[in-house]
């Protein structure tokens, strides 16, 4: 068997063993994908003992390419929500999550100085203590740029593996400590969250309103104050027994019935201006109007504003809702269409069929992966990650690297959505498959490289000390920020749990937080809010630590 064939066969064995280990559950908590690392360590220990030589170039390529696949697909997944998470509504959560990262860096520097821990080891412990694999990849890459030897990089992997188990357990312990310390009633916290955030729910509501305000008689629909702000869509108008699709220049009359779609608070505001809620039916059933959902798949309309399609003027069709990545939005004339958007249309059947030909509505395209944009994005990401940024006082240039470059490019491209006929939509199943393949390849190689000296380090070396350092790096930032968020920030307990899980980019912790109150979305919402920013910080922080401490 050739060296390359042997290396790939061993990697397959590591993946199978590691994924099996990851499925083990102890008190409902498992290692998940992290089990591949320990599968690699186990196999690596025996390959080293038996003198099995693996092709180093093959392993190095697989490790780096796996990391690129993982961070790129992460960026594509969270990109649409990344910039929205930085707006004012998420600033407090992102600030606390960033503080977790900052405190972790400070604790790591303190341990490095006080106990004289080797730099590759403290970087590995730092990454393992926060259960962040891209952080490990970024740390190993910057050490390579600084001229570290291969053996030093193996120490980084061992430090990661030693600190990783408590990294998972530590955040669960923190949630438990916070619950006891503040005598939290989880049901009450969930109820308070719903009350406080009920008006912020993203689900749209409908309201049938009769025009009773005489000042509105004869006005064009676009001139009605409550409807001109873009928060509400009027999808149907009933005058007498006749149901119409209203246009912006449609003149309304007293006693007309309007079917409005929008957020709850916006609908209430409109009701106060227009008139009163009525129990009358504005259903399209029994009329020549239809309600139909179409998917945007035609490259020609990607990036175009809804107003440019002239749907109301040409086809007498109105877009009442827009669903993007599972989130319902109020469509306005300035809304830009992206691949995969789901439009809720109201109009005559033949008109909707004409619009269907314009927007595409080819459902099979949603299951197809356009590979050209994937490699364009990866290529641009690698190029960006290779650009050196020289900062005064640093011994080497800082780079985004193979972890940061593809991530940043993916975030931007996913936010843009499409350029010409290239669109960066990826079906969730395809994204998950590529992401899992990437992280499995990366962890398998890291485990294999670390396995040779892992047992000896743990039993005869400094492994127990490293584990202790990892516990400190895990607990100090989490407990500090958890107490601050509750006492100073007055945050909901479930929101804090989701934020802490997001600050560690830890899916098992999110699963645990969701399990505290399965019907509440508080934890998942805060996790998603902080995840994109934290992932960027987790990738950049080991590089900055390495540059700061390399010459010290």
Curated annotation (Swiss-Prot):
NCBIfam families: PRK03818.1 (NF003007), YidE_YbjL_dupl (TIGR01625). The chain crosses the membrane at residues 4-24, 26-46, 65-85, 95-115, 158-178, 371-391, 394-414, 439-459, 464-484, 493-513, 532-552. Residues 188-276, 279-361 form the RCK C-terminal domain. GO terms for biological process: potassium ion transport. GO terms for molecular function: monoatomic cation transmembrane transporter activity. The keyword Transport applies. The keyword NAD does not apply. Belongs to the AAE transporter (TC 2.A.81) family. YidE subfamily. Its main location: membrane. This is Putative transport protein PBPRA2144. It is found in: Cell membrane. Keywords: Cell membrane, Membrane, Repeat, Transmembrane, Transmembrane helix, Transport. GO terms for cellular component: plasma membrane. It is a multi-pass membrane protein. Coiled coil: none annotated.
